[in-house]
Amino acid sequence: MVPVVALVGRPNVGKSTLFNRLTRTRDALVADFPGLTRDRKYGRAEIEGREFICIDTGGIDGTEDGVETRMAEQSLLAIEEADVVLFMVDARAGLMPADEAIAKHLRSREKPTFLVANKTDGLDPDQAVVDFYSLGLGEIYPIAASHGRGVLSLLEHVLLPWMEDLAPQEEVDEDAEYWAQFEAEENGEEEEEDDFDPQSLPIKLAIVGRPNVGKSTLTNRILGEERVVVYDMPGTTRDSIYIPMERDGREYVLIDTAGVRKRGKITDAVEKFSVIKTLQAIEDANVVMLVIDAREGISDQDLSLLGFILNSGRSLVIVVNKWDGLSQEVKEQVKETLDFRLGFIDFARVHFISALHGSGVGNLFESVREAYDSSTRRVGTSMLTRIMTMAVEDHQPPLVRGRRVKLKYAHAGGYNPPIVVIHGNQVKDLPDSYKRYLMNYFRKSLDVMGSPIRIQFKEGENPYANKRNTLTPTQMRKRKRLMKHIKKSK
C-alpha cells in the first residue's frame, strides 16, 4: 500500500508551499473534492524511487468551534489515515494557542509526528524554534519552504528513514517480483527459466467513483453473481477490502474502497467516501473501473479522479451507471457530453450499464481483461523499432535549426503502463504534436486498448559539447598558409 504523509497546521504556515516542493510542481492539485474534504489537496511525491501520497490539509485555527470540530470537518480524516504527520508551525509568528491545541490532539493520536518550523529564512533557526519545544513533540526541523532551504534535510533525515523503516513491513508483491525479474532479463542478466507470467497473476480491479454513483451496487452485483465469500486479506489497512473472485476461469482481486459495512453504520458522506482509500486503491490496482452517474453527468470530482488515474498510468474502463429508465433523447445528450468532456480519453472502453438490474454488467470483464493484457504484453525491440521506422516513413520528424531530427531505434522501457523508449538525435526538440503522433501510431500498431501508453525519448551525449575546439599543429600550419594567401590576394 502506498504510504501517506499529511501536512497539518494553522492557516498560512506554509503547508501548500511545502506540498508543492514535495510534489515538485507549482500546481500539484491532483484531486480536489470541494464540499466533501474542504481545502484538501492530494498529490503524488517520490523520494529516491519510493512513492507516497502527500496531503495538504486545510488550516486549523482553533476558533470557538473547537479544534476537534474543525479537524473533523477538514483534517481529522487525513490525520487518521496518514502514516506520518508533518506538523508545521510559523517560526516568525512564534508559538500560538492553536499550535498547542493541535499538538495536544496529535499527541493523543500516537501517530508518528514530526515538528517542522517554517519561515526561518533571515532568522537564527536555533533561536526561532526554542518556544516550540514546549509542544513536547521532540526534535524540530527548521525550513524555509518558499526558498527550499532545509527541505532536502527534512527529506533525508525524516521522510526517507521513515519510509525505509516502513518498507520491511510490506508484503512482497508477486507483481513487483515478476517485473523485477523481467527487467533483469532485459538488462542482459542471467536468464532463468520463466515460469512466471502476467496471466498467472490475478487481475487487481478497483471500482472507484463519487459517492452515490452505484459503486456498492455494482460490487454487490458482481459478487452476487459469483457467490464469493468476502474476507479481509492479511496485511491490508484502512478498511480497504480485497475480495478474491473468479470469472470465466480468470482470477481477480476486487478492491472495495468503501469497505463491507452495514448501511446503518455509515453515518455521513465523509465516512462513506474516503479519498485516501480511493487513491491508494488506484495505485494498487492493475485496472481501474471509473463509475459515472448517467443522471448527474460528469462532474469536476469525476475529472479529478480521472486525472489521478491517468497520472498513475493505470488501465481504465469507464462505466456509465443508472442507464436504465432514461429516454432516448437523454441518452443521446449524455453521450454527447461524454464525447465533449472525455474526448481526450481515446483509449478506454465506455460501458453503459444498470448495476441495479444487472444489464451490461457481464460485458465489463471483457474490457478489463483486454486492458490488462494490453498493459502487460511483452513487445520486442525489433518490433518496436520497425513500428518507429514505419511512423517516420509515413510522417518525417520536423527540422530543428535546419537539421532533421533523427530517430534511431526503440525498445520497451516498462509495462503497466507500456513504456516505449526511443533513442535518437535532437529528440528533446521534438514538438508535442509529433510526440502525440508517435504515441497514437504505436497505440494503433500494437492494438493497445484500455491502457495508456507512454513514450520516453533519450539521446546520446555529445562528447564535444561545451568543449573548446583546439587545433592540431598540422591544422595550425595549414591555417597560417591560408592566412598568408588571403593577405597576398588583397
UniProtKB/Swiss-Prot annotation:
Task: Print the keywords alphabetically.
Answer: GTP-binding, Nucleotide-binding, Repeat, Ribosome biogenesis
Q: Name one GO biological process term.
A: ribosome biogenesis
Signal sequence segment: none
Domain named KH-like: residues: 377-461
Binding positions for GTP 2 per the UniProt entry: 209-216, 256-260, 321-324
Pfam families the record matches: KH_dom-like, MMR_HSR1
What are the residue boundaries of the EngA-type G domain, all occurrences included? Answer: 3-166, 203-376
Q: Where does GTP 1 bind?
A: 9-16, 56-60, 118-121
Concerning SUPFAM superfamilies, the annotation shows: P-loop containing nucleoside triphosphate hydrolases (SSF52540)
Gene Ontology molecular functions = GTP binding; ribosome binding
Q: Which PANTHER family match?
A: GTPASE DER (PTHR43834:SF6)
Assembly, in brief, is: Associates with the 50S ribosomal subunit.
The record's similarity note reads: Belongs to the TRAFAC class TrmE-Era-EngA-EngB-Septin-like GTPase superfamily. EngA (Der) GTPase family.
The free-text function statement in the UniProt record for this protein reads: GTPase that plays an essential role in the late steps of ribosome biogenesis.
Protein known as: GTPase Der
